[in-house]
């Protein structure tokens, strides 16, 4: 899976509405103009939450969950945090827009169920994610990409996964593994948004279009982590309900069906990080922020 996520440079004390886009390209699926590059925009949406959570005295109620604007040390990436095993009972995939929308929304609900215990353990919010299969005229993230640029994208400003049915079907047909891989990856960006990882990354950006070598490396760490988070969720659902072990494995392989990219990582690393989540089964397996530069090339 490929995806070009543009993260805005630091905008002072604002939490940015990150516009995350993921394009899924697979070997054997022809696309005009080759692999689609992804673009994104970001808008300030709210004042930042502090990354220092209040320490509650012994015997008092647990602090209210809040995002933590940290990267390598984000509580979500602590040792021992795992997703819940889930049984995803999905409807039949279809070219009918209403039925495909139901397929995506049902899977997104299953992903939310898998991720909630991990977010609870980190005391971070399980923000609701919306799935929309039509393009908005405007959104909290500004101008939307064209079909030539993306297959699906995530907007952190309105916590919405946009997966236009025409774009998705044109790219993936009815190949369930590719639809699942795309949605799991996009939901991975939603988890980054919920936890504060995206906001923390945004604060580190220094170049106007995130095109400096250092900023591109940060973008790769975001993208590769979304692959890992996506595969982590696939593993949590594998072998139960509508997601057989073989289907989950095929979805995992999708993350390696791409080209090398200076904003998304090498083909090898894109698959490597997905496998890290699928096999490791804990969020700490997805700590791209603690990885060496060569591991996120």
Task: Write out the residue ranges for each language-model feature.
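Acidic/histidine-rich, surface-exposed loop or edge segments in extracytoplasmic proteins
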Residues: 82-101
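Post-HExxH zinc-binding segment in Zn-dependent metallohydrolases
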Residues: 210-239
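N-terminal low-structure segments adjacent to metalloprotease catalytic domains
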Residues: 1-78
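Auxiliary, metal-adjacent structural segments of Zn-dependent hydrolase domains
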Residues: 103-158, 220
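Active-site recognition of the HExxH zinc-binding catalytic motif
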Residues: 115, 181-196, 226-227
């Amino acid at each position: 899976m490929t995806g070009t996520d543009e993260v805005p440079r630091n905008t002072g004390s604002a939490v940015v509405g990150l516009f995350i886009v993921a394009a899924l390209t697979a070997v054997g699926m022809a696309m005009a103009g080759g692999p689609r590059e992804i673009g994104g925009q970001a808008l300030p949406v709210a004042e930042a939450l502090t990354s220092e959570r209040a320490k509650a005295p012994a015997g008092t109620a647990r602090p209210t969950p809040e995002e933590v604007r940290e990267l390598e040390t984000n509580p979500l990436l602590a040792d021992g945090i795992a997703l819940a095993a889930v049984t995803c009972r999905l409807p039949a995939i279809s070219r009918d827009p209403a039925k495909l929308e139901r397929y995506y929304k049902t899977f997104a609900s299953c992903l939310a169920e898998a991720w909630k215990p991990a977010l609870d353990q980190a005391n971070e919010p399980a923000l609701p994610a919306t799935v929309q299969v039509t393009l908005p005229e405007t959104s909290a993230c500004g101008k939307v990409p064209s079909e030539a640029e993306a297959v699906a994208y995530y907007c952190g400003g309105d916590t919405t996964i946009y997966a236009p049915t025409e774009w998705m079907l044109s790219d993936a047909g009815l190949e369930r593994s590719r639809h699942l891989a795309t949605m799991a990856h996009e939901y991975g960006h939603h988890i980054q948004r919920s936890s504060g990882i995206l906001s923390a990354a945004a604060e580190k950006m220094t170049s106007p279009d995130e095109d400096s070598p250092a900023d591109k490396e940060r973008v790769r760490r975001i993208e590769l982590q979304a692959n890992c988070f996506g595969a982590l969720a696939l593993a949590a659902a594998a072998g139960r309900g509508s997601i057989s072990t073989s289907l989950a494995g095929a979805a995992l392989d999708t993350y390696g069906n791409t080209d090398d990219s200076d904003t998304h990582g090498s083909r090898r690393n894109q698959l490597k990080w997905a496998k890290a989540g699928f096999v490791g089964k804990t969020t700490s397996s997805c700590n791209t922020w603690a990885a060496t530069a060569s591991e996120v090339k």
